[in-house]
């Protein structure tokens, strides 16, 4: 068994091959261009038939390389940067450079057998791109809305009596009328406010167009079980699928929960058994599960009963919600596994 560790960067990638005992076989460094990536893949192929490739930054600087590795049929796992840092600290070889990191990445993969494998599911990759683009538009709209709010406080004091929130087309139309009234006294502020209103309309149209694309891409995926979960609408489902990148990468629901940051971390010592909050994991998935938990806490009787049981056990409201998120991680995992099985059946038919 040969394990290849790759430390990916914007301009160059360092790769190290080790055997099953952790001994270094060979180290290579290549550029990030297409020809250099092909040379790296050819080098990996020549190492033998049984191999595993571990990439740090597989979804970042190493994304182009990872896609080519998957297209070439390689088994690829993603190594989180904190695992590399932990491995480097525990090594007898001190210091840090790309070669040391590549060797460390390979050794991390050797001792961590349950690392999630990467897949070449283009539908999930497209969902992530679309959802990320929409999230950026929504975030920009929030910033523009805040600027407009600050301008309206001077242009139209007390404007909140007429406008509850600067979110709908009707509210923006009312805001425009208020701006026009105060235009003579504050021409510069009025000009900036009108530009902000135009920008909000534009961002809204772009976000709506992306939502249509997201729903279309989601329909091709047919996640019927996932969408049946209370609180999981099209946008949340697309976020979960895009960030998960193939549920079958995770052998168990516990592994998925750990990836989402909803599984508490053991912090026991001696006779004391306790757990602490997990602040790691994929925070986008964690956020999506938080959204589902908040919806269920309001509308799902089973979720409300679950929260009441946790409160009766002595947990605080926040702790009870964390327990619900951990429970929902399993519910979502099971739903995605069921959808994946149905997709395989459809493909085989």
How should these model regions be labeled?
Residues 10-35:
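Short glycine-rich, Thr/Ser-proximal phosphate-binding strand/loop in the N-terminal lobe
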